[in-house]
Regions:
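Helical segment within the ABC ATPase nucleotide-binding domain
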Residues: 169-181
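Conserved ABC transporter NBD signature motif
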Residues: 57-67, 73-74
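Catalytic Walker B motif of ABC-type/P-loop ATPase nucleotide-binding domains
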Residues: 154-158
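Conserved catalytic motifs of ABC-family nucleotide-binding domains
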Residues: 150
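Conserved ABC ATPase signature
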Residues: 129-133
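Conserved ABC ATPase "signature" region
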Residues: 79, 98, 102-125
Length: 244
């Protein structure tokens, strides 16, 4: 499914968290969203999920405005993973996945949970309470939760934060493979520049609620004459600071 963001803005108390952003994610494409804390990434994701009402602008999914979708329909096609969203601490990993699976109307739920536990290496702690897990384990559970309904659109916020390098690399490979097999459209918000270069077809850079550059990693790097995406991002952000 394709997503088009058109002139999207959100104000809180007369201050813009997001201001007039425009971009498109094609079907089975991954777009990376980069920016410092407070740049508007989380607000943008919240609007795309239908959790935050835009001040102005439109979100178009497969040529239909998000406002025309019933909540159940949105739940069936879209999901979200973030290590910063707390899971019920007193419930086990399995119980958490069961709850979310029922919420999303997943058929053959037991099989789906077993499948994700195998794919994301959750089996060793599937019956542990989430409050007893490490931050890296919680992150993998959050990713499993986001895939429970096999969404066509996946919004990922720092999916490999707090993961050991080997596990982080495994998760990145898994996301790549899952996208290819299931034709999933992905928005990836990350501070990991190498991760964005590896996983994303194109990149959006944000600061203070605005898009300051976008294109493929190669296009952006070449445009600013730097060696890699991290150097390029730092140059652009500092240039914006000097202008401000």
């Amino acid at each position: 499914m394709s997503i088009e963001i058109k002139n999207l803005s959100k104000k809180f108390n007369e201050v813009y968290a997001v201001k007039n952003i425009n971009f498109t994610i094609g079907t089975n494409k991954t777009i990376g969203l980069l920016g410092p804390n407070g740049c508007g990434k989380t607000t943008s994701i919240g609007m795309m999920l239908g959790l935050i009402k835009p001040t102005t602008g439109d979100i178009i999914i497969q040529n239909k405005n998000i406002n025309t979708f019933e909540r159940n329909k949105l739940l069936s096609i879209m999901n979200f993973a973030s290590p910063y969203v707390e899971l019920p601490k007193k419930l086990s990993v399995k119980q958490n996945l069961q709850i979310y699976g029922r919420l999303y109307g997943v058929k053959d739920l037991s099989f789906r949970i077993d499948e994700l536990a195998e794919d994301l290496n959750l089996k060793d702690f599937i019956n542990k309470k989430t409050g007893e897990l490490s931050s890296g384990q919680k992150n993998r559970v959050s990713l499993a939760k986001s895939l429970i309904n096999k969404p066509e659109i996946l919004l990922l916020d720092e999916p490999t934060a707090s993961l050991d390098p080997d596990i982080g690399d495994y998760v990145r490979s898994y996301v790549q493979s899952y996208k290819s097999k299931n034709k999933v459209t992905i928005l990836l918000a990350s501070h990991n520049m190498a991760e964005v270069e590896r996983l994303c077809d194109s990149v959006i850079m944000m600061k203070k609620g605005k898009i300051i550059d976008q294109g493929t990693s190669k296009e952006i790097i070449n445009r600013h004459g730097r060696a890699n995406l991290e150097e390029t991002f730092l140059k652009i952000v500092r240039s914006e600071d000097e202008v401000a």
